[in-house]
Design a protein with these regions (language model features):
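Short, solvent-exposed loop/turn and secondary-structure capping segments
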Residues: 26-29, 159, 259-264
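Helical element adjacent to the flavin cofactor pocket in flavoenzyme catalytic cores
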Residues: 165-247, 252-253, 265, 271-280
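Conserved FAD-binding subdomain of flavin-dependent enzymes
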Residues: 34-75
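Extended hydrophobic secondary-structure segments that form protein cores and membrane-embedded regions
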Residues: 14-21, 71-75, 248-250, 374, ...
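C-terminal segments that line or cap access tunnels to active or ligand-binding sites in enzymes
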Residues: 170-183, 245-247, 252-453
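Glycine-rich FAD pyrophosphate-binding loop
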Residues: 4-31
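Rossmann-like flavin
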Residues: 62-169, 180-182
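Short, well-ordered alpha-helices that flank and scaffold nucleotide-derived cofactor binding pockets
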Residues: 2-5, 197
Length: 453
């Protein structure tokens, strides 16, 4: 989009290689035939995503003629501001009464302040546990922060510091998420589709079902030139030759790589294998050519520490709705804000959080149904009602665990999960790979030293 708008490049000079049959990457939202609605994750946005909103001021709305996606987004959140009436529960759906408090001691506050002002180089390869102790980890602040951003205790202290600095304006709104903004529908329909229509309208060429398996560089003293893009197109090998006048933009790695999708009756398999065409495999092959291209193994070598799971739940009738409404204290069918961001079951073995955004979440969503999202930070610990790890659970079993934490009577849980909901689990082995401890040089520069194209 920037190449077209700001770079004045002709659209038919731009080629996008996409390994899936649809675009959007992690910004997804679709209905799989025979499985149901699936959203792997969601975007928590705010007023200070300046680059993003600068882009969407130029992307026309698909719903309202003559206005931009940014216009729609601004008007929507002005008329229906986001905030939560219940940020956390405990004891099976009871308000945890965090009551807007951070619960930080003086020592905990000092640990946060010290981290904020620590030079980056002193945090290289350090974990969050190296800079915080129980004064922070037992606080409401850490509950709010870790579940909002999906930080684990073993993640990078440097990344924690960078997030604190980038989202300092969120701190006051952490207890009720009032700094967040959301789109009308799921992220794919509200953001990706308008962008794709804009690009298609300018003649950009999309190549779907096309895996990039390698990019071969010619390396000479002080110069790195991408010479060939190696492709698998419907499993047939192809090569695209490049010149110094071409520009190559690479997605190195990827948080939703090796994703597996289950169903109401099947678990989502944990399979972190890196195959040709996978973003991590591609980055490894590029990095093997020169150290300036980074060290992907720092991020993708321990999927046990970079995974979590989500599930998309669709209510099929009215029986679950009162339990949702009891917690969020709003009418889920109003078309306005429902939970106002995630609700965390703070005493959940999976550290389960869930949310229902404005309904319908999909344009074709049947009337009378709700589509929500659940995620668990701990995929390998037993549940509280379902006594096995989340990664081993079917969609129905994940729904049962969620219903337990909503406060549904135990003698109704299985019936509601089976007949009143459809739940689709998703396992993402590398979803927090970018949070792993790191040092300088592990991530390549946006334009690596000596790169010419």
């Amino acid at each position: 989009c920037y190449l077209i708008r700001d770079g004045q490049m002709k659209g038919d000079h731009i080629h996008l290689f996409e390994k899936r049959s649809i675009p959007g990457g992690a910004c997804d939202g679709c209905q799989y035939p025979g499985i149901g609605y699936v959203m792997r994750g969601g975007r928590e946005m705010d007023d200070h995503f300046e680059v993003m909103w600068d882009l969407f001021r130029s992307i026309p709305s698909l719903e309202t003629e003559g206005v931009s996606v940014l216009d729609e987004y601004y008007w929507l959140n002005k008329a229906d501001p986001n905030y939560s009436l219940c940020r956390a529960t405990e004891n099976r759906g009871q308000n945890a009464h965090t009551d807007g408090k951070f619960g930080l001691s003086d020592q905990g506050c000092m640990e946060l302040i010290k981290l904020f002002f620590t030079p980056d180089e002193q945090l290289y390869d350090k974990r969050i546990t190296d800079v915080f102790d129980a004064e922070v980890f037992s606080s409401n602040f850490w509950l709010y922060w870790r579940t909002m951003f999906a930080f684990e205790n073993w993640h990078s202290a440097l990344e924690m510091k960078l997030y604190l600095k980038r989202y300092i304006h969120h701190v006051g709104g952490l207890p009720d998420l009032r700094a967040l903004r959301f789109t009308r529908y799921n992220q794919y329909e509200s953001m990706i589709l308008p962008m794709i229509r804009y690009l298609e309208g300018h003649g950009v060429r999309f190549h779907y079902n096309t895996k990039v398996t390698n990019i071969e560089f010619e390396l000479t003293e002080g110069k790195k030139q991408a010479r060939t893009i190696c492709l698998l197109v419907d499993d047939e090998a192809e090569r695209v030759d490049l010149t110094e006048n071409d520009l190559v933009f690479i997605t190195n790695g990827g948080c939703v790589e090796s994703t597996s999708i289950g169903s109401q009756d099947q678990p989502a398999v944990f399979n972190p294998t890196l195959r040709p065409g996978n973003g991590w495999d591609l980055w490894k092959k590029i990095a093997a050519q020169d150290e300036a291209f980074g060290r992907p193994e720092k991020f993708c070598s321990d999927p046990e520490q970079t995974n979590w799971m989500s599930a998309t739940v669709t209510t099929l009738d009215e029986r679950i709705v009162p339990y949702i409404q009891n917690i969020c204290q709003r009418d889920p069918f109003s078309g306005r804000t429902v939970t106002g961001g995630i609700v965390t079951a703070r005493d959940s073995g999976w550290l389960l959080s869930w949310t229902f955004n404005r309904q319908p979440q999909f344009r074709d969503q049947p009337k009378g149904q709700l589509v929500g999202w659940i995620y668990g930070l701990f995929s390998n610990t037993p549940g509280d009602y379902i006594k096995k790890p989340m990664r081993d659970c079917t969609g129905k079993e994940i729904c049962m665990e969620w219903l337990y934490h909503l406060g549904v009577p135990e003698n109704q849980i299985e019936d509601l999960a089976e007949h009143s909901a459809n739940t689709v689990p998703v396992m993402m082995p590398y979803i927090t790979a970018f949070f792993m401890p790191r040092a300088v040089g592990v991530r390549p520069a946006v334009v690596p030293e000596g790169a010419v194209n």
